[in-house]
Amino acid sequence: MRKTFFRLCFELSSHPVLSSMLQAFTTSKASRWLIPSFVRVYNINGQEAEKPLHTYQSLQEVFTRTLTENCRPIDLSPKSIVSPVDGVLAEQGTLSDEANFVVKNQTYTLEEMLGGKEKAKLYREGTYLLFYLSPSHYHRIHSPVNGTIKEQWTLGNKSAPVNNLGLRYGKRPLSRNYRLLTELEAEEGRCIVAKIGALNVNSIVPTHQSEHVDKGEEIGYFAFGSSVMLFFEKGTIQLDHQPRAVEVKMGEKVGSWLR
């Protein structure tokens, strides 16, 4: 019962009234008494949190917690591409020559995902990775590569769940939900970090301050349930993992540049 309640709080309903009520509650001090239960239900490692868990003032503060320094070692190999988040690497593969990709038996077009034909053409036959974050995960987002931010834009106005059931039975939530997309240019090629929210504009908060970002540097955080997708140009990277769901940590190597 408690896990169902917490899942409602952080993955949220697509109904706007319920979503607003849950958001108001989880960000208020009234939710503080639920922190111990939340920590137990999701097995949150308090030793990793930057502050003692009893000092947080709301469920939201625990959910968006920062970690202690060096808690997540960054793979600094020159050619490495690292996971931008703690989560499940749920899907990965190659985009079709028509720039399509399939997640949970649903076909997505990159044109809809990125918001335009010209941008989609750049990544046709490229590589994609999908990371799903559950309420138990650390919800800060980090850069997967060293690079310069070339462009950042927002798309979408839906708020469907992006959990396993939402991805399977929802109406293309990855390309319809509100999302913040950041295109990075590295020496080896370009990539797009697509941060997909499950509530509204306030569910994704950018934190980077400069145009250049280092691999592993924080670039934002999710206030509520979420997913992240990475897109790379054709022939620029090689993936590390087999195409099956695998738990990964932020900073862990998930691929390599080929150039």
UniProtKB/Swiss-Prot annotation:
Its main location: membrane. GO terms for molecular function: phosphatidylserine decarboxylase activity. The modification Pyruvic acid (Ser) is found at S226. Its cofactor is pyruvate. It catalyses: a 1,2-diacyl-sn-glycero-3-phospho-L-serine + H(+) = a 1,2-diacyl-sn-glycero-3-phosphoethanolamine + CO2. The record marks G225, S226 as: Cleavage (non-hydrolytic). Its EC number is 4.1.1.65. InterPro entries: PS_Dcarbxylase, PSD-B, PSD_type1_pro. The active site is at D86 (charge relay system), H142 (charge relay system), S226 (charge relay system), S226 (schiff-base intermediate with substrate). One of its GO terms (cellular component) is plasma membrane. It is a peripheral membrane protein. The keyword Lipid metabolism applies. Keywords: Cell membrane, Decarboxylase, Lipid biosynthesis, Lipid metabolism, Lyase, Membrane, Phospholipid biosynthesis, Phospholipid metabolism, Pyruvate, Zymogen. Pathway: Phospholipid metabolism; phosphatidylethanolamine biosynthesis; phosphatidylethanolamine from CDP-diacylglycerol: step 2/2. Is synthesized initially as an inactive proenzyme. Formation of the active enzyme involves a self-maturation process in which the active site pyruvoyl group is generated from an internal serine residue via an autocatalytic post-translational modification. Two non-identical subunits are generated from the proenzyme in this reaction, and the pyruvate is formed at the N-terminus of the alpha chain, which is derived from the carboxyl end of the proenzyme. Pfam families: PS_Dcarbxylase. It is found in: Cell membrane. Belongs to the phosphatidylserine decarboxylase family. PSD-B subfamily. Prokaryotic type I sub-subfamily. HAMAP family: PS_decarb_PSD_B_type1. Heterodimer of a large membrane-associated beta subunit and a small pyruvoyl-containing alpha subunit. This is Phosphatidylserine decarboxylase proenzyme. It comes from Halalkalibacterium halodurans (strain ATCC BAA-125 / DSM 18197 / FERM 7344 / JCM 9153 / C-125). The lineage of its organism: Bacteria, Bacillati, Bacillota, Bacilli, Bacillales.
